[in-house]
Amino acid sequence: MISDTQIFVALILALFSFVLAIRLGTSLY
C-alpha cells in the first residue's frame, strides 16, 4: 500500500522534473 509520504515525494519529483524540463526547453530556444 502506498503511503502519503511516498505520494508527496512523487509529486515533488514530478513537479521538479516538470520545471526543469521547461527551463531546459526555454533555454534551448
UniProtKB/Swiss-Prot annotation:
Keyword set, alphabetical order: Chloroplast, Membrane, Photosynthesis, Photosystem I, Plastid, Thylakoid, Transmembrane, Transmembrane helix
TM segment ranges: 7-26
Main location: plastid
The keyword Membrane is assigned to this record: yes
Cross-referenced Pfam families: PsaM
Gene Ontology CC annotation, any one: chloroplast thylakoid membrane
InterPro entries: PSI_PsaM, PSI_PsaM_sf
Biological process annotations from GO: photosynthesis
Subcellular localization: Plastid, Chloroplast thylakoid membrane
Membrane topology: Single-pass membrane protein
Membership in a protein family: Belongs to the PsaM family.
HAMAP family xref list: PSI_PsaM
Protein name, per record: Photosystem I reaction center subunit XII
The species this protein was found in: Guillardia theta
Lineage of the species this protein comes from: Eukaryota, Cryptophyceae, Pyrenomonadales, Geminigeraceae, Guillardia
